[in-house]
Structure formats: C-alpha cells, structure tokens
C-alpha cells in the first residue's frame, strides 16, 4: 500500500486523534495527557516507547534491517496560553489554553508516520520519533538534549515539520538550512 493510500484510509482516526488533543490542550512541560495518548498509540503499534526525556517528552523507536543509520522525526506537543473562541465540537475544554499553532496536528501527523512505518518497515535503519514538550514557551528541546536524547538515540539528521496554513493543500515546502528556528539559542 502506498503512503497516501494508507494515510487516506486512516484519515478519520487521525482526525479524531487530532480533535481529542485539540480539545485538551496542555501548556509546555504539562503535556501529560498528550504524552499518555502518544505512548498508548505507539505501544499499540508495537513501537518501543521511552518517556521522561525533557519532562513530558516521548520517544518511539522504529527499526528495520541492519543499517546503523538513523534519522529523527519531531513534532511539538504543547499549546498556547490563550482563550479559544471557536464553537466547534472539539474546541478547547480548558479555559486559557488553546492549540492555536497546530501542534495538535503535528502530533497527529507524526503518529500517522509512526503507524505507517511500524506496519510497513520498508526502510533500512532506525527512525526516532520525537514528541517534544514545551516548544512554544521554549526549553523543551534543550531539556530533551540535557536528558541525553542524542546520546541515547544517535541520529545523523532530525527533521521537524510545521503546518503552514497559507500553503495549498497537497503542497510541500522546504528550505536549505534551519527554518522557524530560534537563532539566539
């Protein structure tokens, strides 16, 4: 099965997961419910789970073949400290907290990749699935690194992604070098 077909077949489940996360936003270093959901899904798909890096961070490991090569795929999990005024069914149920930057979608997208990789394993190497806390307030990546992320899970490259509402559906954008990264840390 092709990736697009697989994702399309999982669309309803992925949307439900994103909506569940959206309805229960958690601020930086408070992503306990989200981390529990991520760990439960990864475990369900047979992916070994490592918790506690950076406080509430979650790491899943998908291996196949004999290569020592490894890449990381990263999604941020935290919400923003702002009130949601949307009225749809999955609007925030927590006053003063909202997934306004799309991290609920980022988690759902990385979970989709995790599920596909776990079920198809058509690669040679290791994929480290990094669910990072506290991106908005800062410090989540730093704390995961302090807790030994790169020592425990050596990787040749780490890829993060971010939704971009102005980009047409089905489009993909890339740029050489860092994008949307803080230049002062």
Regions found by a protein language model. Give the residues of each.
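Histidine/acidic-residue-rich, glycine-tolerant segments that coordinate divalent metal ions
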Residues: 58-59, 80-82, 86-98, 105, ...
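Acidic/His- and Gly-rich active-site-bordering loop/insert found
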Residues: 1-99, 108-111, 115-116, 120-123
């Amino acid at each position: 099965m092709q990736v697009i077909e697989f994702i399309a077949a999982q669309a309803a489940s992925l949307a439900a997961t994103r909506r569940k996360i959206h309805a229960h936003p958690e601020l930086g270093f408070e992503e306990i419910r989200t981390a529990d959901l991520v760990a439960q899904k990864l475990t369900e798909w047979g992916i070994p789970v490592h918790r506690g890096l950076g406080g509430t961070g979650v790491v899943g490991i998908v291996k196949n073949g004999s290569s020592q090569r490894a890449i990381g795929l990263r999604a941020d999990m935290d919400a923003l400290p702002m009130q949601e005024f949307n009225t749809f069914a999955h609007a925030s149920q927590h006053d003063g907290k909202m997934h306004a930057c799309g991290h609920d979608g980022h988690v759902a997208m990385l979970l989709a990749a995790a599920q596909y990789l776990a079920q198809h394993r058509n690669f040679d190497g290791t994929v480290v699935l990094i669910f990072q806390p506290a991106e908005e307030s800062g410090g989540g990546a730093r704390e995961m690194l302090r807790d030994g992320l790169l020592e425990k899970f050596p990787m040749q490259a780490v890829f993060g992604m971010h939704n971009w509402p102005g980009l047409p559906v089905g489009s993909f954008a890339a740029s050489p070098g860092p994008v949307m990264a803080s230049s002062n840390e």
